[in-house]
Curated annotation (Swiss-Prot):
It is found in: Cytoplasm; Nucleus. It comes from Oryza sativa subsp. japonica (Rice). SUPFAM superfamilies: N-terminal nucleophile aminohydrolases (Ntn hydrolases). Non-catalytic component of the proteasome, a multicatalytic proteinase complex which is characterized by its ability to cleave peptides with Arg, Phe, Tyr, Leu, and Glu adjacent to the leaving group at neutral or slightly basic pH. The proteasome has an ATP-dependent proteolytic activity. GO terms for biological process: proteasome-mediated ubiquitin-dependent protein catabolic process. Keywords: Cytoplasm, Nucleus, Proteasome. Coiled coil: none annotated. This is Proteasome subunit beta type-2. Belongs to the peptidase T1B family.
Length: 212
């Protein structure tokens, strides 16, 4: 029941993900951070098999650090996305990773950007996206409510609406979520959402209209 959400706003990008580590019917932990800070201005939200997810995101992170160490300059977000896509495509023909990625970053020359890369190395630059079962509900909400000029508060509010809809619609919904942001100030954690009560009785009027 993994859920990863990404949104690009006005000179920033937001990536959110659930924090549940689940296998079959068991919940192993509820504080698993699935949004990795790759470097000072890049975030990678990932879903998929836990072992593949952890190994692949750490592999990308260490290679970015190695490139910067050797060349004294960081990779751009676009270059990082192409490198990530290339590694998934190469592994697909050998020992594939079952990992889906939303890569967000900020570059001084182009601003914030978000890239969609799935486990078969499909690659797109997008403004909004989601992976996991939650994407069935988030994508319709974002189609209705998303605007390219959103402020940070508006983007986080949209993410919160997506989370509420996920918790309303999924039979077994994640309880905890983490939200991170990247902008000219860098990549950092913005907020956490923890729900210990029962799922909401109804979504917001906008969410209910879209999901109906």
């Amino acid at each position: 029941m993994e859920c990863v959400i990404g949104v690009v706003g006005r000179d920033f990008a937001v990536v959110a993900a659930d924090t549940s580590a689940v296998q079959s019917i068991l919940v192993h932990k509820t504080d698993e951070d699935k949004v990795m800070v790759l470097d000072s201005h890049k975030l990678m939200g990932a879903s998929g098999e836990p072992g593949d997810r952890v190994q692949f995101t750490e592999f990308i992170q260490k290679n970015l650090h190695l490139y910067q160490f050797r060349n004294n300059i960081p990779l751009s977000t676009a270059a990082t996305a192409n490198f990530t896509r290339g590694e998934l495509a190469t592994a697909l023909r050998k020992n594939p990773y079952y990992v889906n990625v939303l890569l967000a970053g900020y570059d001084s020359d182009v601003g914030a950007s978000l890239y969609y890369i799935d486990y078969i190395a499909t690659f797109h630059k997008i403004e909004k996206g989601a992976f996991g079962y939650g994407s069935y509900f988030c994508l319709s909400l974002m189609d209705k409510l998303y605007r390219p000029d959103m402020s940070v508060e508006e983007a986080v509010d949209l993410v919160d609406k997506c989370i509420k809809e996920i918790r309303l619609r999924l039979v077994v919904a994640p309880q905890n979520f983490i939200i991170k942001i990247v902008d000219k100030e860098g990549a950092r954690e913005y907020a956490r959402r923890a729900y210990t009560d029962s799922p909401p009785e109804a979504a917001t009027s906008e969410a209910a209209t879209v999901a109906a």
